[in-house]
């Protein structure tokens, strides 16, 4: 059984590789070669006000590489105010750590093949998935990005977009101005492109070719009316998107053929915004994510406003993790990375 660290994962998983892995994944999914159990979240009360325990799981099988993967995240989450906005954050334990695990099983023998944390892989998978969507929906000449958010996932969005478009300029806004400035400076230094912090969300959106929302906000971070003809809009979190965008955009990808996130909570104890969250009605002509990825449906004109919301990213989510984690495990073995542990430590001689 191969034990990997985030550093190991980073050494074998490039953003470009991940885009290719997901592109093939959706090809195989279209042939019926993927099985997914959708994301499930369980919520329990916590002693601290506005704080909850959350266990998040999802899983999937990809027989074309002989892997079945289960993702388990165990978190304590809390809400906090940041200026006029409400934010959600995961509370670290011990020495500043979080618990997120991917278990990789063989579909040929049933044994546990590998264990790895999900941190670097998750950021890369999200960036690659949204890049794949942008490859189909953004204008071919798109080169300027308006980015809302300055955290871990926000950086992943730019790294992904650079795999499918020649990005030359990024305008970034965050309600945390100090972090936004540091983020812009670091991203510009690492990528060698112009990354400029701006004073308002509207300044970031105006005249951008691609508008990427990647915040930890519990409410909308921009107005749908700001979206301009020809722009491609995406959102990593459900609550950060103005629901009117579903009506205002010309081409919208949705995921209504699969159950949405399954939330389980003890009694009435659950974050209110989780309990109240409902998907907006699918607009006429909306494209199901299943058909979007299988057929690689693209924009129809230069002035078309396109939208790839969070719900679309959840299509075959467990299977996405299986494909990427399976690729990482195979590549790590090829390169001699990780620590081999006796499989007997994780097996038993009793049949339950």
Question: What is the predicted role of each segment?
Answer:
Residues 154-155:
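N-terminal Rossmann-fold NAD(P) dinucleotide-binding loop
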Residues 192-279:
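Rossmann-like adenosine-cofactor binding region
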Residues 6-10, 246-352:
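Adenosine-phosphate binding glycine-rich loop
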Residues 118-122, 235-241, 312-318:
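Glycine-rich phosphate/pyrophosphate-binding beta-alpha loops
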Residues 164-188:
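NAD(P)-binding Rossmann-fold cofactor-contacting core
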Residues 138-144, 166, 228-229:
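Short helix-loop-beta connector
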Residues 1-123, 129-131, 141, 318, ...:
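N-terminal ligand-binding/catalytic initiation module
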Residues 150-151:
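Glycine-rich Rossmann-fold phosphate-binding loop(s) that bind the pyrophosphate
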């Amino acid at each position: 059984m191969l034990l990997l660290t985030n550093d190991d994962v980073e050494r074998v998983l490039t953003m470009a590789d991940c885009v290719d892995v997901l592109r093939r994944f959706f090809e195989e999914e279209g042939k019926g070669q993927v099985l997914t159990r959708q994301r499930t979240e369980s919520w329990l009360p916590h002693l601290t006000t506005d704080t909850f325990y959350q266990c998040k799981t999802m899983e999937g099988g990809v027989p074309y590489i002989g892997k079945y993967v289960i993702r388990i995240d165990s978190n304590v989450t809390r809400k906090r105010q940041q200026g006029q906005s409400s934010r959600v954050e995961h509370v670290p334990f011990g020495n500043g750590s979080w618990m997120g695990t991917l278990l990789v099983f063989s579909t040929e023998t049933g044994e546990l093949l590998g264990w790895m944390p999900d941190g670097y892989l998750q950021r890369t998978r999200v960036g690659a998935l949204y890049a794949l969507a942008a490859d189909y929906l953004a204008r071919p000449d798109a080169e300027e990005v308006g980015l809302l958010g300055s955290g871990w996932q926000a950086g992943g969005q730019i790294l992904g977009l650079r795999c499918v478009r020649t990005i030359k300029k990024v305008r970034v806004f965050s309600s945390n101005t100090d972090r936004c400035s540091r983020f812009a400076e670091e991203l510009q230094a690492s990528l060698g492109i112009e990354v400029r912090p701006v004073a308002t969300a509207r300044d970031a959106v105006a005249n951008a070719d691609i508008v990427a929302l990647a915040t930890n906000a519990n409410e909308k971070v921009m107005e749908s009316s700001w979206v301009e003809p020809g722009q491609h809009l995406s959102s990593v979190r459900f609550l950060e998107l103005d629901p009117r965008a579903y009506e205002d955009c010309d081409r919208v990808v949705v995921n209504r053929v699969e159950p949405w996130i399954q939330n389980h909570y003890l009694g009435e104890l659950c974050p209110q915004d989780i309990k109240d969250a409902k998907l907006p009605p699918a607009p006429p002509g909306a494209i199901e994510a299943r058909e979007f990825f299988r057929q690689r449906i693209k924009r129809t004109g230069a002035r078309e406003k396109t939208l790839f919301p969070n719900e679309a990213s959840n299509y075959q989510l467990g299977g996405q993790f299986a494909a990427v984690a399976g690729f990482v495990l195979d590549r790590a073995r090829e390169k001699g990375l990780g620590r081999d542990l006796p499989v007997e430590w994780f097996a038993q001689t009793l049949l339950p």
